[in-house]
Regions:
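Cytosolic regulatory regions of ion transport systems
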Residues: 1-190
Length: 190
C-alpha cells in the first residue's frame, strides 16, 4: 500500500483518485508515528520539490517508516556535481524533482523494458540520459521486487538466463537487442 502525506488537500484528492491512500498533514507539525494507517510502511520516499523538507522527512521518520529503505530526491547541487550525495539515501542519481516532473509531463505512463545483461542496462541508461523526457525509476527483478538503480550501474550484476526490467517514466525507450518492452506494467499483469 502506498500512502501520500501532503499538507495540500488538492494533492491528496488527486492521489486518492489514482488509488493511493492520502493523509493531509504537515510533517513539521504532525506526529505521524501515531497514525495507525502508517504502521505497515516499510519504505519512506521523500519526493518534494524542497530539499529541506526531504532532509527533514528522512531525519525525523527514517527510523520509524524506513525499515526497508528511506530515500529522498537528489538535490540540484548534487546533480550538478557541486556536492557529493550520500550513497545510502538518494532515490535517483540522475533525476531531481524538476526532471521527474518534466518526464511526467511528457508521458505519465510508467513503462518497463527488459534487459538480460549489464551492458544492455548501460545502453538503456545511456539512451535515458540523452533524452530529458525519460526518467529511470527502478530495476525490477524477476520476482517482481523493485530496487533503486545503483549510483554506478556498472556494478549491477545479473545472473545468466535472468531477465530484469528497467522501470521508467516518460518517452519510450528503444528495446535492447533480444529484449522486449511493456507499457503500463501494472495494467498488463492484472
Amino acid at each position: 500500500m502506498v500512502h501520500l502525506v501532503d499538507s495540500n488537500p488538492g494533492h491528496i484528492t488527486k492521489a486518492e483518485r489514482a488509488g493511493l491512500e492520502g493523509i493531509v498533514a504537515n510533517i513539521y507539525n504532525t506526529d505521524l508515528s501515531e497514525r495507525y494507517e502508517l504502521l505497515d510502511v516499510g519504505y519512506l520516499l521523500a519526493f518534494t520539490s524542497s530539499d529541506e523538507v526531504n532532509d527533514y522527512a528522512l531525519s525525523r521518520y527514517e527510523k520509524i517508516f524506513g525499515e526497508s529503505g528511506a530515500y529522498r530526491l537528489i538535490t540540484v547541487d548534487e546533480l550538478k556535481g557541486r556536492m557529493t550525495p550520500s550513497e545510502d539515501s538518494v532515490f535517483s542519481y540522475t533525476e531531481d524533482f524538476i526532471n521527474l516532473s518534466e518526464s511526467n509531463r511528457e508521458s505519465a505512463i510508467v513503462r518497463e523494458v527488459a534487459f538480460t545483461t549489464t551492458a544492455q542496462l548501460l545502453e538503456l541508461m545511456a539512451h535515458a540520459a540523452a533524452d530529458v523526457d525519460i526518467a529511470p525509476l527502478f530495476i525490477k527483478y524477476p520476482d517482481g521486487q523493485l530496487h533503486v538503480i545503483p549510483k554506478d550501474p556498472t556494478v549491477f550484476e545479473i545472473t545468466t538466463a535472468t531477465t530484469c526490467h528497467l522501470v521508467y517514466m516518460g518517452s519510450e525507450l528503444p528495446a535492447t537487442t533480444g529484449a522486449h518492452q511493456k507499457t503500463e506494467p501494472e495494467e498488463e499483469e492484472r
